[in-house]
Amino acid sequence: MATVKPFRGVRPPQDLVEEIASRPYDVLDSEEARVEAGDNEKSLYHIIKPEIDFEPGTSEYDPRVYEKAAANFKMFQEKGWLRQDADENYYIYAQTMNGKTQYGLVVGAFVNDYLDGTIKKHELTRRDKEEDRMKHVRVNDANIEPVFFAYPDNEVLDALIKRYAATKPEYDFVAPDDGFGHQLWVVSDKADIDVITKEFAKMPALYIADGHHRSAAAALVGAEKAKNNPNHKGDEEYNYFMAVCFQASQLTVLDYNRVVKDLNGLTSEQFLDALRENFEVEDKGEAIYKPQHLHEFSLYLDGHWFALNAKQGTYDDYDPIGVLDVDISSRLILDKVLGITDLRSDKRIDFVGGLRGLEELKRRVDSGEMRMALALYPVSMKQIIDIADSGKIMPPKATWFEPKLRSGLVIHKLS
């Protein structure tokens, strides 16, 4: 059963939240962060992308960069740009994208739940990325950014959230970079806090939607602090890390598409012939064509869109991995025909997240940068949960969640 707790959030005053809040650290590079921060000294990028305070080209892994993050976090608090709440609260966070709003509960998730598998993952993590995030957590003694969880739909929590959503939020703004709405409510009522804690305690599992490296880093630092504390009792703040938990049915998973630089020595016709072994191939013409259902793919090649429908027998409906379109495309197109065996390291392939649309696939091929593009039907939350429950791991680059969590609305200190 899942254990969560309220915590004393560190957060901006109402009048500063729009200046401080930012996109997450991993959706933009250092130079993009430098441009977005501009001359805004209050931008959270000075804490989560502190290399922007050094000469361009400074490595984000430079020891001075981590130290700068800690110095800036301290300075933000000293200047009153970030203040810690007096009491332990939960928080309700709403995101609005294209007229649709989803509501998450900001909680302290239990480190032991991650270590024992109650918090379920569906992606492999890389040790170098874990270590980077661990250094950031250690030096700040805080989870500056939350991780993104899904939980099974719950009518009690849904009713509680709706009650708060009908009241005036603590924060309410539209982010200038993406046009998405962000709102936050503080749950300080003791009875409501008890309800949230007890409802989570009934849940057999929580699911990481996005933020596998942040989750691993937070849990590993928590375990490290417990091991190094001779007076460890188990109720210390480092036993918890900050997560925003959304009902699974509210979440939108977008398509995560592929662009490839060459056809592995094949002509276009040879490539299409090779695909016909496992797919029904239909030329859809020059107008952009989006996959309409599971096991249908859209190929963009030589100015034309093709529908590729996987033939019966090319996938196993009873295998939670083998039935995924990301697996089918990796096995039968990228590996078998194009010779791309490692999606993480092969320089011939790149990935385009769903919000950028199929127009971006067309642009990258038409420009000559890429030879072909492949659009996939989005993975469903049910598929993600089935895989996590089975203890298996999704293929790389399978899920793209939008909207991304806004960073800087709430921060969790570990002591």
Please describe what each predicted stretch is.
Residues 1-415:
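Surface-exposed, charge/polar-rich loops and edge strands
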